[in-house]
């Protein structure tokens, strides 16, 4: 099957040897293997509190062929032991993610706390978020983590927001761009960590918890383009490798992209093709299509 994206361009930036590895690896994967690569499993220390799964790690890896792993916070020994075990069972090197938005404490118990997004912005010193990114990368990669599910590039327009009120880096696009860029510069200064910004299309405008109910960003297309859109466009042009979609709808923009979309059919970005395929990939050009 021909590639639909150009792996030499952003956000991949692969050389010929790396592209050959990708193609050779895909060639020996079965369809079941490839389906498994789409999923990231959340692991727990002391039992799975959500799914009731009682499979061993080896059984889970052999059955589902997952592409990535995320874990609930554990001790350094627990985290490193889990990652090493999972990697030993995987055909393809696993993507292992942690939420380090303020330092290494997001990767492991006892990790170094540097600064929250709000503290970084309040300092008015880009060196603070730079150090948060630097320490995050040092401590998470020491454990075997290779993907960082931060920073939050959201904009706080509602101080009652329960998710990003202290994790976001400001109340306007300029501050968010400045301080999240500094964080990402620190994150990648010494280590090869995959950058992942969130929560597309943007949290911080409302009070609901998008983890529990549908989040809604009610900005008009024009308002979004001048705020959240500016932030995402900046980071995409800078080469960010991954963007996490939130369980957040952007109804006025979605209906502009798809005029036939009824109110009752509006879905969050995690399920909305007009937001992921049209706005993020086509308009903002997250993925470089092969010419």
Locations of regions flagged by a protein language model:
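Short, acidic/polar
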Residues: 47-63, 128-139, 223-232
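Short, conserved phosphate-binding/catalytic loop or strand-edge motifs used
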Residues: 113, 153-163
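N-terminal hydrophobic targeting/anchoring segments and the immediately downstream early-domain regions
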Residues: 1-113
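Conserved, mostly hydrophobic/aromatic
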Residues: 30, 69, 99, 125, ...
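Second-shell residues forming the walls of enzyme active-site clefts
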Residues: 80-88, 92-94, 104-106, 174-291
């Amino acid at each position: 099957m021909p590639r639909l994206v150009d792996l030499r361009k952003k956000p991949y930036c692969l050389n010929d040897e790396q592209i050959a590895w990708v193609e050779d690896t895909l060639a020996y994967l079965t369809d079941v293997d490839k389906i498994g690569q789409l999923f990231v499993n959340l692991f727990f220390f002391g039992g799975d509190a959500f799914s009731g799964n009682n499979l061993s790690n080896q059984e889970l890896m052999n059955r589902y062929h997952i592409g990535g792993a995320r874990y609930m916070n554990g001790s350094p020994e627990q985290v490193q032991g889990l990652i090493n075990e999972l990697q030993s069972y995987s055909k393809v090197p696993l993507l292992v993610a942690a939420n380090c938005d303020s330092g290494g404490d997001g990767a492991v118990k006892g990790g170094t706390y540097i600064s929250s997004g709000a503290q970084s912005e309040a300092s008015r010193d880009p060196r603070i978020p730079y150090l948060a990114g630097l320490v995050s990368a040092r401590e998470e990669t020491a454990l075997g983590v290779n993907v960082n599910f931060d920073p939050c590039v959201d904009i706080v327009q509602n101080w009652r927001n329960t998710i990003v009120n202290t994790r976001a880096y400001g109340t306007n696009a300029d501050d968010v761009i400045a301080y999240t860029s500094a964080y990402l510069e620190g994150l990648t200064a010494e280590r090869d960590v995959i950058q992942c910004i969130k929560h597309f299309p943007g949290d911080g405008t409302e009070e609901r918890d998008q983890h529990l109910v549908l989040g809604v960003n009610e900005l008009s297309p024009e308002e979004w383009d001048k705020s959240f859109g500016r932030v995402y466009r900046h980071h995409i042009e800078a080469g960010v490798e991954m963007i996490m979609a939130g369980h957040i709808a952007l109804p006025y923009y979605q209906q502009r992209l798809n005029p036939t979309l009824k109110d009752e059919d509006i879905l969050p970005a995690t399920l909305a093709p007009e937001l992921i395929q049209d706005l993020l990939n086509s308009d903002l050009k997250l993925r470089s299509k092969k010419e």
